[in-house]
């Protein structure tokens, strides 16, 4: 998604807030080179990265090793399809799951979410991140690609918050929080000075769960639970 260091810092903060306390078990579905997994391991989580690419998993292992023994010992790589997590790791075996940048890249989104639900223990937490179709449409339109914007407005591979909530419900996952990442932040913001960076981070944190800002964010971050009915949440969250 073109997320820079600052964007990752914002996302990581939201993920840590959503997850149960360490040393909970977490599966990172489609975790690739392990940027998020290793960061979570650094906070004490026991993370299993599932990815189809052996090369990606090798990079993940090296990234973990570079962080030292304790972190490396908390990261495990498993080569396989994220749509088959219960078979790979065991039904209900994980306290939490993270799945970022994968949902809109698979052919069968329902199968992926069913897999994530199946690997979670009852009440387990899912942190789900994906490119926001509304943001993509706005970006295309502002760049003068009105035909591209129209295609996105009418549908396409990317999805919206409401569409994601329906998919989650079908998988037996209740949406409990939704936030935006990258409302104002851009990849080039990594070069901001310390004061500007702190101001931007605080701005992003304050608007992440508020409309209309959330719906115009680059990335949507959804938190769901297995087997838990959605509560009535404050208006600034859902």
Roles of regions detected by a PLM:
Residues 98:
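A conserved beta-strand element that flanks and buttresses the S-adenosyl-L-methionine
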Residues 110-125:
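A short glycine-rich, Lys/Arg-flanked "PGG" loop and its adjoining helix->strand segment in the class I
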